[in-house]
Regions:
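Canonical Radical SAM [4Fe-4S] cluster-binding loop centered on the CxxxCxxC motif
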Residues: 11-73
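Short Fe-S-cluster ligation motifs
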Residues: 57-71, 75-94, 315-335
Length: 355
């Protein structure tokens, strides 16, 4: 049962959305997250060499967390159950790559069984999805989002470090077949890398009747190689697509929605723009993140993490954990500072935080 007092912060924002990372590991090496391939190094090296005063960044040291530090399914279920009791109703399972977590369909089933969870989704790169899809659907997964940054096999491999385009495309088809609607597909747009594919990706969304999201490149890569010049602003993407397609604005009834959306004139599919760099949506943010090792993050770009694992493993009561969650949320940052002089990139990459 939802408590009378909402889980709110000091700015009046009420939390409804919990992102749950189940692993910090990933089988891709995406250029915007874990750029550990030679092709990624070459891409960024060329960008830094072009600067008048190049200052190569110091990469974040990546160390996978040992299994003993990762929350068990029972611990994850407990946190979600308590969060739902405080008003959370949307849960998204993330990673790393969540399908690398052995028995993930068991966890999905447990989360689906929590009264009050009205939207249970997963974000995946799609590479392993065909092996797990039916079990996930039967367990209660309602929606799924895939990453698809390129439709060109060579460019796809350059971006992700894997020769996996065919697998991801097959996963998208399978998700539609299983009724995991609406199937969402995300593309991180990086200038000089895949911005020439914007129209092709949008046309793919229209033909496949997908909900496609173009996302601005964010400073969450382990190479600390993010540069503002590599960001393609959302307005630029929209302008380019409006010149090619008949797009019609979609009005949202949810002020906390991160994407500005447009439908295609023929009624098949839609595109959305997620622009955290050029058009931050912090003022309506209603999201929390639970990392795989049991930390709560109140902002994707926060430098502070709040440990729940110690409470979970230290015998804390439900009431104690609920009280701690309220304290954490009350301290939620007003906004991020990307692009400002005081911005400091988090010490964890997107793969470790959970998208």
């Amino acid at each position: 049962m939802i408590r009378s007092e909402p889980l709110s912060d000091s700015y009046g924002r009420v939390m409804r959305d919990l992102r749950v990372s189940v692993t910090d590991r990933c089988n891709f090496r995406c250029l915007y997250c874990l750029p550990e391939t030679e092709q990624a190094a070459d891409f960024y090296r060329a960008k830094f060499d072009a600067l008048k005063n190049p200052s190569p960044p110091t990469p974040i040291t990546r160390e996978w967390k040992p299994r003993s530090q990762i929350l068990t399914f029972e611990e994850v279920e407990r946190v979600v159950r308590l969060a739902v009791g405080l008003g959370i109703n949307k849960v998204r399972v993330t990673g790393g790559e969540p399908l690398l977590r052995q028995g993930i369909e068991t966890l999905v089933g447990r989360l689906a069984g929590i009264s009050g969870v009205t939207d249970l989704a997963m974000t995946t790169n799609g590479f392993l999805f065909p092996q797990k899809a039916r079990a996930l659907r039967q367990a209660g997964l309602q929606r799924v989002s895939f990453s698809l940054d390129s439709l060109d096999p060579t460019n796809f491999k350059k971006i992700t470090g894997r020769d996996g385009l065919r697998s991801v495309l097959a996963s998208i088809d399978l998700a539609q077949e299983l009724g995991l609607q609406p199937v969402k597909v995300n593309a991180v747009v990086i200038r000089g890398l895949n911005d020439h594919e914007i129209e092709a990706l949008a046309d793919f969304a229209r033909r496949k009747d997908l909900s496609f999201r173009f996302i601005e490149f964010m400073p969450l890569d382990s190479g600390r190689a993010w540069q503002k010049d590599l960001v393609v602003p959302g307005v630029e993407v929209v302008r380019q697509l409006q010149a090619r397609f008949d797009l019609r604005p979609v009005q949202s009834s949810n002020p906390s929605e991160t994407a500005k959306r447009w439908s295609f004139g023929d009624g098949r599919g839609e595109i959305g723009i997620i622009a955290p760099v050029s058009e931050p949506f912090c003022g309506h943010c209603n999201r929390l993140r639970l990392t795989a090792d049991g930390k709560i993050r109140t902002c994707l770009f926060s430098l502070t993490e709040h440990d729940l694992k110690a409470l979970l493993r230290g015998g804390a009561s439900d009431e104690t954990i609920e009280s701690r969650l309220r304290e954490i949320v009350w301290q939620k940052e007003e906004r991020h500072h990307i692009g400002e002089p005081d911005f400091v990139q988090p010490e964890r990459t997107m793969s470790c935080i959970g998208g």
